[in-house]
From Swiss-Prot:
One of its GO terms (cellular component) is cytoplasm. The keyword Transferase applies. It is an enzyme of class 2 (transferase). It comes from Vibrio cholerae serotype O1 (strain ATCC 39315 / El Tor Inaba N16961). This is Acetylornithine aminotransferase.
Length: 403
């Protein structure tokens, strides 16, 4: 029988690789949009595990799906398929443009699969010289060597030796730069339909439409990284549906499992046929436990009233942030869409987003940052208006301590 060992925050420094700098408190229980730490302190969660906990913590629909599947079948590998994976794949094709699905364990793996597929497709159809990948500065696509190199942030990609080649980074939303770079050598353009880690930056409608047209002109694939924006986060099931531009390949993860690790790459049958047996794979991809939970999440989030509710909650969040800004005048703008929002700090507050995050934690509120000067909010898609107002009151108190 396993004996539960006593651990605290100092245990992290003792035994964990120092990739992270976690908060001083350790959550031990969560329900809905609230969590409690080892000392019993309660927090309202506006972070959602970085846009993951779309139904909050321990939602009964997810708990039931996991419990039921846990009593049936845990793992097979892809030597065999399984019912939850097939049902989930069917449902993902029903809520998107896709005809084919590849399952992985994370957003990074989904993006890795997307990039490999794009390169494979281009080589098969047009020849090996068509290999250039265009991505954008301040983008973020994961931490594998390929995806972190495609992501346009040197902080994450430098220091590991030679990078994968034929990757070009351009300014986001800069159509002239894209027009000057894209050519018949371009294999794919990869972008977030709303940059998350890069500061919650939305593209213009004209830019996204032009990207699609330029990709078509040069026979390049358009890859949308919807790891953070997907599964209802923006008020559409996928963000591309709200901007009227359909990609060729889409990567999804985070909210897909609502907290249970899963990722997926979605594409068309024509493109997918180039990923033949043995070309790519994942031992855990399509795991029955993960797919059972994700199926429950998709069923819940895809309801029209849930998606409409995300848009309503965006308005509640914006109204409360405007109240705070009228009082303290520290935000220059509120960015984003749905429940992927960022409060960009003004010149006087530049670089102090983490100060606000830490102060908020001391007041019982969990928030995120998106760079040094943007406070990010990615709460549950079904957080109540009362919890939004209460959380914002705690944010108000936190900011007051920094004035």
């Amino acid at each position: 029988m396993t004996v539960e060992m006593s651990v605290d925050r100092s245990s992290f420094d003792e035994v964990m690789v120092p990739c992270y700098n976690p908060m001083e408190f350790i959550p031990v229980k969560g329900f809905g949009s609230r969590i409690w730490d080892q000392q019993g302190h309660e927090y309202i969660d506006f972070a959602g595990g970085i846009a993951v906990s779309c139904l909050g913590h321990c939602h009964p629909v997810m708990v039931q799906a996991l419990t039921t599947q846990a009593n049936k079948l845990w793992h097979l590998s892809n030597v065999m398929t399984n019912e939850p994976a097939l049902r989930l794949a069917k449902k993902l094709t029903q809520v998107s443009f896709a005809e084919k699905v590849f399952f992985a364990n994370s957003g990074a793996e989904a993006n890795e699969a997307a990039l490999k597929l794009a390169r494979r497709y281009a080589a098969d159809v047009y020849g090996p010289e068509k290999s250039e990948i265009i991505a954008f500065n301040q983008g973020f696509h994961g931490r594998t060597f390929f995806t972190v190199s495609v992501g346009g942030q040197a902080t994450y990609s430098d220091g590991f030796g030679p990078k994968p080649g034929d990757i070009v980074h351009l300014p986001y939303n800069d159509l002239a730069a894209l027009q000057a770079q894209i050519s018949d050598r371009t294999c794919a353009v990869m972008m977030e339909p709303l940059q998350g880690e890069g500061g919650i930056v939305s593209p213009s409608a004209e830019f996204v439409q032009a990207v699609r047209e330029l990709c078509d002109k040069h026979n390049a694939l358009l890859i949308f990284d919807e790891v953070q924006t997907g599964n209802g986060r923006t008020g559409d099931f996928y963000a591309y549906q709200g901007i009227g531009v359909t990609p060729d390949i889409l990567a999804t993860a985070k909210s897909l499992g609502g907290g249970f690790p899963i990722g997926a790459m979605l594409t068309t049958a024509k493109i997918a046929e180039h990923m033949k047996v043995g070309v790519h794979g994942s031992t855990y991809g399509g795991n029955p436990l993960a797919c059972a939970v994700a199926e429950a999440v998709v069923d819940f989030v895809a309801q029209p009233e849930i998606l409409a509710g995300v848009k309503q909650r965006e308005q509640w969040m914006r109204a409360e942030l405007e109240k705070i800004n009228q009082k303290y005048q520290l935000f220059k703008e509120i960015r984003g869409k749905g429940l992927l929002l960022g409060a960009a700090l003004n010149d006087e507050w530049q670089g102090r987003a983490r100060d606000i995050l830490v102060a908020a934690g001391k007041q019982g509120l969990m928030v995120l940052v998106a760079g040094a000067s943007v406070v990010r909010f990615t709460p549950s898609l079904i957080i109540s208006q009362q919890e939004i107002e209460e959380g914002m009151a705690r944010l108000d108190k936190a900011i007051a301590t920094l004035m």
